Amino acid sequence: MERVTRMVVRDRNHPSVVMWSMGNESGWGPNHAAAAAWTKEFDPTRIIHYEGAQGNPQRRGYVPLRSVGKWKTAEEDPVKGEYADLANPDDRDAVEVVSRMYPTVDELERLACDTLVRRPVLMCEYAHAMGNSVGGLGDYWRVIRRHDKLLGGHIWDWIDQGLRKADGRGGWFWAYGGDFGSRENHDANF
């Protein structure tokens, strides 16, 4: 609660704040619900989103977690035939936006067309900008422009992942992972 209340009180007058988020990839529990309720009461002018609020157990079609942070897969739930976090038709009532991370273009279109989803849909992360990426934006935006329910999304993360390091010849470069001697500290294509 304290982090959220401090953030909201501190940032409530910033014109670039268009909505509040209850966190990032930290599960869901009573503290999230309480923080969302407090935030909405303190600032009713902005909407609330949180990707951790995926799936409302009171809604038809809800697919429960099989363990912390792990959703049932298509093999475990052949009725859904897809990852359950994207298949859950709606999110908890504490949030006003259905948030999804990295949906495919087809998954985004399914959410837009799903009659059980009555709230706006936001890709809270998509088109990860690490390395040689950020492709397919045209496909996403064709779908977004077709459906009023879709808000768009936030490209993650529009920043260089490296740290400035001297190159030994008087210059510098953006170093990452194995550039610091360890071969275990890297991300996939780095």
What is each model feature region?
Residues 1-189:
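Substrate-binding/catalytic cleft of secreted carbohydrate-active enzymes
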